[in-house]
Amino acid sequence: MKFFYSFFLILIFFGVVLVFLFRAGWYPLALVNGNLIWGFSYEQEVNVALKYYDQLTKDKVLDETQKEDIDVEIRRSALEKIIQDVVLADRAEADLGVTVQSEIDSRLAKYMTDKKLEGVANNYFNMTLEDFKKMILEPQALKEIYAEKFKADRKDFDIWFKGQLKAASVTLFTSEYKFNRGILELNS
């Protein structure tokens, strides 16, 4: 009988721990080319996008249906952005070499000393400068590096990138979305 109570208490303990981990975002949301996307990074991306959108539309009056539609689209776009960033970063080392991070850092160095950038990150995105760099600036700099490389080779970056997204191995651990030929769509 003592074994049963001990087992039951251990089971309850692990259940409570799992609930706290899940609420903190420690659950896998997607697997992209072998890289896990965690719930906390998705929620952070969504919160940043919602904060930015609120700043842009603070004077507009929207009804509840419009707000819900916008919220759904922001959530979809946030996950799609994370998937795109992972696919691009995954290809970067193979395509551009191991110096890609140093090139990104050198591009961003001149902006990182600007005090106004910290204010923009804080006021418009509700982020620290370091988080802003990691989530917004670095992926954008990588896209620019690729675009310049493709332009120099007289190729179209957008067509290549769409092909990379179509070829990416994306497994979603949510029934809310489906990844269809490189595009994240809402499940009907």
Q: Model-predicted segments: where are they?
A:
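A C-terminal, polar beta->alpha supersecondary segment
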Residues: Y27, K134-S188
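Proteins with a high burden of low-complexity, intrinsically disordered sequence enriched in S/T/G/P/A and R
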Residues: F7-L11, D63-K67, N123, N187-S188
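Generic alpha-helical secondary structure signal
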Residues: L9, V46, L56-T57, K115, ...
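N-terminal targeting/tethering segments
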Residues: L21-E130
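Charged interaction scaffolds used for protein-protein
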Residues: M1-K2, F157
